[in-house]
Amino acid sequence: VKQDVTKILIENKKAIGVQLKNGQQILAKTIVSNADPSITYLNLIGKEHLSKGLVKKLKKTKYSVTSLILFLTLDMDVTQFGIDSGNIWMMKDENDDANFDELMNGNITEGDSFPAVFISCTTMKDPVSFNGRYHNFEVITYINYDSLPEFNGIEDYHSEDYKIFKEKISAKLMNNLEKIIPGAKQNVVQIELGTPK
């Protein structure tokens, strides 16, 4: 069940649960966060619960290469396009260094597609997970962490600007996918973009 966590609850210097956006508190013995360390510690736990040394270290942390991951379910027979359990590395050309430089230095919201993506059909890799109709994909590209727009605070990640950003990036990744699976856009059942922020 997808829930928006706004706070990790701390009692006697120990994480004891989480608080949801609706105010509900869920207590637990173990709390797991898959957010960046700075988001987990500074935004969800809060500086007031951290040592000065940890706060200083978090503020000095320089993120470098990261990735954007499009999680996708398609309602179509993708085998007709040669999709199997193999991985697909799609590059706009053979110059890996130039593609990498473009990903690291460009504005990630500009353009129609990315110069390099990795595509994997998880239902072909794990046939037991295939229900006979829907295929799941992961479409991944790498980017410079600093090229991500700055969204401050938990609320910004539910703002209209953040949704527009995610839609632009998802559309670009779908354009990459369409090059090997024509008609993919018309057969999307579920789509979600994972970002490092």
Regions inferred by a protein language model and the residue ranges of each:
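Mid-domain catalytic core of redox enzymes
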Residues: 6-131
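C-terminal segments that line or cap access tunnels to active or ligand-binding sites in enzymes
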Residues: 76-196
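Short loop/edge segments at beta-strand edges and connector loops
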Residues: 1-3
